Amino acid sequence: MTTSPSSSADLLPKSWDPGAMESVIYQKWLNSGYFAADPASTKPGYSIVLPPPNVTGSLHMGHALEHTMMDALTRRKRMQGYEVLWQPGMDHAGIATQSVVEKQLAINGKIKEDFGRELFVDKVWDWKRESGGAIAGQMRRLGDGVDWSRDRFTMDDGLSRAVRMIFKRLYDAGLIYRAERLVNWSPVLRTALSDIEVIYDEIEGELISFRYGSLDDDEPHIVVATTRVETMLGDTGIAVHPDDKRYQHLVGTTLPHPFIDRELVIVADEHVDPEFGTGAVKVTPAHDPNDFEIGLRHNLPMPNVMDVKAVIVDTGTEFDGMDRFEARIAVREALAVQGRIVEEKRPYRHSVGHSERSGEVIEPRLSLQWWVRVESLAKAAGDAVRNGDTVIHPASMESRWFAWVDDMRDWCISRQLWWGHRIPIWYGPNGEQVCVGPDETPPEGWQQDPDVLDTWFSSALWPFSTLGWPQMTPELEKFYPTSILVTGYDILFFWVARMMMLGTFVGGDDAITLGGCRGPQVPFTDVFLHGLIRDEFGRKMSKSRGNVIDPLAWMDMFGADALRFTLARGSSPGGDLAIGEDHVRASRNFGTKLFNATRYALLNGAALVPLPALTALTDADRWILGRLEQVRAEVDSAFDGYEFSRACEALYHFAWDEFCDWYLELAKAQLADGLTHTTAVLAAALDTLLRLLHPVMPFITETLWQALTQLESLVIATWPEPSGISLDLVAAQRISDMQKLVTEIRRFRSDQGLVDRQKVPARLSGVEDSDLATQVGFVTSLALLTAASNDFRPSALLEVRLGPNKDRAVVVELDTSGTIDVAAERRRMEKDLAAAQKELASTAAKLANADFLAKAPEAVVVKIRDRQRMAKEETDRIIARLAGLQ
């Protein structure tokens, strides 16, 4: 049909170009102040803190997923009438940032000690101002609706004050102490590391079994095995299981160390697995976490045999001064000379911790550090979830939460760095120490502790320090506790648990309780844990595999909306997400489909006006409006349960499969018949659909909705309320039957090789009995049929079973004579058959390959099987069609 120009359609570009449009739209949002939060507002508050990315970082796919979810939640709540604060900020990232600046200095042959601490820290601040925070621009590219006027940094003055305040309070409460305990030690960075900064990789090493005690089998001796034979220089004991009869007679005795004047005590400990190896383990308390615990239980000496550079020291042996790896070879050779080597396994694959930043092998090492005593804090964090003050989504993650907080070890909070929050402890000339709070002055002449705090310590204060704590502020009153924390399950312990511990520790403060006007608070009422992103085959992304996806590249190719929709559609609570380029391309195509549908509606005069009474509408109108209300309810339910995938699936299938593929086609027929109210239904459906899609696809929906409504912005539009229109079941059944009838006729046309758009004479019977009299026009139009003439001679017949119970039928007689070029159709089908048979052979060969089946991920095998099944079905279909081709 012909369409007349529409001024509303003229507001749209000819096609959707995200690269040209998205940044312009985002800047308009910023200029309009839509994302600014007002603590004085009378609206109910809703707040989310952005997990602060490292100031050194750039947007990775995990960020993109997390930010998409948070942006969707805050956009929806804003539309629902909440005063929304999405708090942005960055983490000072102690080790990462110091490493970046040190590498820059190294280019000019300099090290940080050439400048001294104060000048070096100034240089780090200079780097932060000039080069740090690139991720903020990338967040804008993604469409993050954060309140940029409140952007914070974990070393801001206000946040630094909060850090010193809570350190002082924890110290005064006896919850911070200094002790020599085992840590992850980086010999390159020369600092303790947190567990999350240690990456475990499989390496090929060696497993050396050697003998302590006599070389005579009839005399007391024990064989032990280790992958770090150099650590035997620090051995002070040998552990066996108390029930292991092989060694019971030796428990309590000693064996001499072969290189050092030291006796090794043989102890009975249930940690030992008697079935593993020889059932005996060497105990190096200062250089192995399990051995450290055994050493504590049995009061074993704990000599530290490596310095901060992992050089052997203080053993009084020839190995002193050797690097640990040099010593590994030398100790093994010395043991061999004495005849103590029992077995050498080489190569021996095993998992070894490496520094995430510097890449070297981590050395467990006894070190004097500052610690938080976590027992009472962890209990409070656990109780907050047990009591329902904080709810974890999905609930299946609760068990992991309790496993961590109920068995948490004390937290090492000191780092041997220059960049970070300096530990507020001062030492006097005679070894005295004092903790100095933010409003106190250290004694004159005393020296401050040189260490800085673990980055996770300051980020653990993030939910309340960014809102002004320890001061009583309007922001704390309005936006605390925060509404939800969105983060990955992989940092549930490292960040979430620590926020809960410190949040509950200050939860009863006047600043939090508003001077006692409300009870103690938790840092967030809900926690949503998302999974990890994997490649399209379900494999973990890694640089070594070459399968790391850059979200910025995908946004450049397909647009931010497409990336966001892909991530939201693929996510499930707590589940990992596998995506590939085909997924984001499909999302881009979905956006294009929406654009074209809206443009068509506007060109045909779609405008928001009051809808006629339902009785004045057609079956198609009542069906689409009823389905829209069902989808609205499902989307609301899904968002409320943080089921982003369910919301997106409902919207995708409604928009594409029902609205675009069917209702638009029916609307064309209705408009051709002069049913002018159709434009109102089109507009009403699009208005609701675009508002529902806006949280996930904000850019294209903004453009389309503004053209449709000519109103200011979807960002401040209202969220769709229940329409009161329930699905008309009679109308829905008629539409369903009509769709099936049209689909079957179209399938028949395709099988017959009819030319696209070629109309075919047909006669339909059983229409009245099937309650489809009102749908005949749609069937004729959509299936490209013409009325049967007086000399109609059907050459084909098909019967289509209809109705909810398949108890009704419409018989379609068609005259296809003269409509097919048989020779050309045969050539086309033979070409298609060859392609289908090639695919069938290829997939069959893969599935017959035992090596492939053993090594390929299950998801890949399933895909190959699906391809084989479809190729078989296509082959059979074409063969049958060729056989019947006359």
From Swiss-Prot:
Keywords on record: Aminoacyl-tRNA synthetase, ATP-binding, Coiled coil, Cytoplasm, Ligase, Nucleotide-binding, Protein biosynthesis
PROSITE patterns per record: AA_TRNA_LIGASE_I (PS00178)
Annotated InterPro entries: aa-tRNA-synth_I_CS, aa-tRNA-synth_Ia, Anticodon_Ia_Val, M/V/L/I-tRNA-synth_anticd-bd, Rossmann-like_a/b/a_fold, tRNA-bd_arm, tRNAsynth_Ia_anticodon-bd, Val-tRNA_synth_C_sf
Coiled-coil segments on the chain, per record: 820-851
UniProt motif 'KMSKS' region: location: 540-544
GO molecular function list: aminoacyl-tRNA deacylase activity; ATP binding; valine-tRNA ligase activity
Disulfide bonds: none
Superkingdom assignment: Bacteria
GO cellular component terms, A-Z: cytosol
Name of the top EC class for this enzyme: ligase
EC number: 6.1.1.9
GO biological processes: valyl-tRNA aminoacylation
Reactions performed catalytically: tRNA(Val) + L-valine + ATP = L-valyl-tRNA(Val) + AMP + diphosphate
Residue ranges of the motif 'HIGH' region: 53-63
Subcellular location(s) per record: Cytoplasm
Predominant cellular place of this UniProt entry's protein: cytoplasm
Keyword Coiled coil: yes
Binding site for ATP: 543
Comment on protein domains: ValRS has two distinct active sites: one for aminoacylation and one for editing. The misactivated threonine is translocated from the active site to the editing site. The C-terminal coiled-coil domain is crucial for aminoacylation activity.
Assembly mode: Monomer.
Its biological purpose: Catalyzes the attachment of valine to tRNA(Val). As ValRS can inadvertently accommodate and process structurally similar amino acids such as threonine, to avoid such errors, it has a 'posttransfer' editing activity that hydrolyzes mischarged Thr-tRNA(Val) in a tRNA-dependent manner.
Family of the protein in this entry: Belongs to the class-I aminoacyl-tRNA synthetase family. ValS type 1 subfamily.
Name used for this protein in its record: Valine--tRNA ligase
Taxonomic lineage: Bacteria, Bacillati, Actinomycetota, Actinomycetes, Mycobacteriales
